[in-house]
Amino acid sequence: MLNTMFKNILSIMLVGTVFTAVAQQPTAAMKSKLAPKQLMTDITLAGSKLVAVGERGHILISEDGEQWQQANVPVNVLLTSIDFKNDNVGFVTGHDATLLKTTDGGLNWSIVNYQPELDKPLLDIKVLNNNVIAVGAYGLFLQSTDAGETWQDSFQDELLIEDDRLYLEELKEFEPDTYIKERQYMLPHFNSINVIGEELYIAGEAGFLANSDVNGADWQVIETDYFGSYFSIVKVEDSLLLAGLRGNLFKSEDDGESWRLLNTGVKATINSAFKDSQVTYFFANSGNVFYTLDNEVINNYVLDDGKAVMAGVVLNNFVYLATEAGIKKVPTSEFTSNKARD
């Protein structure tokens, strides 16, 4: 089982710098027939293809959900997230501040950023037209506005608590070297970045939630009165659903002004969410897939092996799952009715 400690490991750069950083040459991922049965952390669609990422630099591609081809990947670190701009251009994040790019639908990947000396993983990435943002531990924030051709790293000081912001302002003026060192660990882990309508949302540790316009400017903190970590947020109709540790799932019907706890019935950390046309899925530890048809009643499907479910996507009447024990699929018919809970 992937416990909270493992999720926190997954959740474990200077202003205005344009970069492509490769401080040292990494080791390329090895091809393995067992890759589809090993830890996978995220899965998405590139056109009609399934593409999944996971441990040891594994990236897997499938046309039919049955046969999986392993991509050529120049790193062997734990990969954490994947997203595509179109059928061909996509991006992957991972540990050692790894950022990869493909231009051929995921078959071959090149390094955009690789900085093991930072000791900070990138945890999530989202692509919206030409705007690409990757986030990670201790407020790591990398952005491209030209579909990944050039990148900037920035420190989002508007997301600091007030005391920390004032402290850093003083350091910046009188002790600039200390300022650079101190600010490296002042922001919380940014666990996920999510596109909701014309806004971006970052969910993170210690109850952190913030949003901005779709360009990633003018970030504002949203208070939630919860101090555990969040890992995903999704909007369904007029409601925001915010997911985190120990099965905590919160609902807001007033754009984040107030939140109330929904009953998932199981204290399993929710790792990510996916919204289909009729069903919203929440993928969780201990084999749990929470789902809702009405944004209120939370149902639960449990994998027989009890392995953590990290992410999922729907294709051709199946939900394809990235799990602790590899890629699995479940018919969407398993998620079509509300189930009574005691």
Positions of PLM-derived features:
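N-terminal signal peptide c-region/cleavage motif recognized by signal peptidases
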Residues: 18-20
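Bacterial N-terminal signal peptides that target proteins for export
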Residues: 1-10
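Residue-level hotspots at or immediately adjacent to binding/recognition sites across diverse folds
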Residues: 23-342
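Hydrophobic alpha-helical membrane-embedded or membrane-associated segments
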Residues: 12-15
